Amino acid sequence: MLRAASIRLFLCGDVMTGRGIDQVLPHPSDPTLHEPCIRDARRYVKLAESVSGAIPRQAKFDYIWGDAKAELDRAAVDLRVINLESGITSSQDYWRGKRIHYRMHPRNIDCIIAARIDCCCLANNHILDWGYKGLAETLRTLDAANIAHAGAGRDAAEAAAPAVCDLPGKGRVLVFSYGSPTSGVPWEWAATAHRPGINFLEDTSKKTAHYIAGEMRSFSQDRDVIVASIHWGENWGYKLTDEETGFAHQLIEEGIAVVHGHSSHHVKAAEIHNRRLILYGCGDFLNDYEGISGYEAFRSDLTLMYLATIDPQQGQLLEARLVPMHVERFRLNRVGEADARWLCDLLNQLGAPLGTRAELAPDHAITLRSSRG
């Protein structure tokens, strides 16, 4: 039985509402791209349609969330947190020397509102794709929509500050967002005392984990739940380095309730460590990659809704329920048993060395449990 005062979080990986997805929403941006191979964002829509079928244009704002929207409502989530990996801007000032640039038109912010997203993590390798003007417009747009954000700001102090999310009758959740160069974040995107940018994570040593854990605790009050959202690691591959696991373990041992990792285009390992949750790579949640070949074995079309129930008094995990989804036609769809089983087997394979197992329920949801007691 879950305690009445427990806090249920929804966490997911990269939400990439720019480029192709932006083109099918009611207010598409100028489709001009500055990529080596594709110069028009509408080409990504055509690629997706070539393998998945017709995608509606001028789609309703809630279209992309598909079956995930009803699942969120059913789960009675207290706080909805995403990694927003797209600027929200009409800026034309694209970052020179960068191969890929993501942006969503500001008038399409209603697609984020439609899913009742509470908090956007911004410290990633696409939030400054359209320059400092693009970042400033992104922040203004989120503020105007009353959506909390963390990880980017007008200076280093603002970028490092948490999103403070008050949950009446339950307490507070502090969400911190960090971007690592291992995910492709340019060093020059680091915010400084006199320059806008992101909350830059220079390395993933235990020493740095100790330092930033202290910084996070300095913002907290008694019984606050602290989430460290980290954009780190390569796009493809399951291997975790000793430094990555050591970094995550150090954060947990210093009182962080959840390590929310993302950047990989596919689901990676999850771990329950000291009765707290580590998500090493949540995988892309929404993107426009349909029709792009080369990494099919990773099944990046399958993703997970991570529903973590936390005891705010101890910061410990009470339940980790994962709901599989399949991305098709730029929309999140429920999966069948075979796809749910594939994800469950993957999590067991990756979690076994970490002392974490996955159990598949008849409704195709997956529960994480510690195998170490």
Locate predicted features.
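Acidic, metal/ion-coordinating pockets
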Residues: 1-373
